[in-house]
């Protein structure tokens, strides 16, 4: 009997709309309740002690200044610095010690679409062996999908020029 139902398709019922549904053609906007989601950059500590920073939706070929706070990390102490890494897309601008942790400000370039992860390493200035990895995760939209609402702590600082071969001055070989 189970084999006979294996290829059967489920029945689909009709769709009903609420009584107050607006007429077709009415101009509608999507509104989100403020309590449905947080509108700030999310910082979470992973099981291994490293951090994941979710900065939300960004637009491709745009530069952003991202500010967030890390909770205190005992092994790092108060004085920390960014370890230079060979990445063009994430640059630490400043690290400020606070009463409860550190405030980090960085510059992020959204260079391709999709879910992107860039990492920085923060090290103790007093203990050579103490460091923590911070992964910045962004969901980057292509240029045809509108302008995303930026989270608190994320600020667009400019756009990157997109290379288009049709705009080139080069006309090829004669």
Curated annotation (Swiss-Prot):
InterPro entries in alphabetical order: ADISSP (IPR026794)
UniProt entry keywords in alphabetical sequence: Secreted
Main location: secreted
Extent of the signal sequence: none
Pfam families according to UniProt: DUF4517
GO cellular component, one term: extracellular space
Cellular compartments annotated: Secreted
Keyword NAD found: no
Function as written in the Swiss-Prot or TrEMBL entry: May be involved in thermogenesis and glucose homeostasis.
Similarity comment: family membership: Belongs to the ADISSP family.
Listed name of the protein: Adipose-secreted signaling protein
Organism of this sequence: Xenopus tropicalis (Western clawed frog)
Gene: adissp
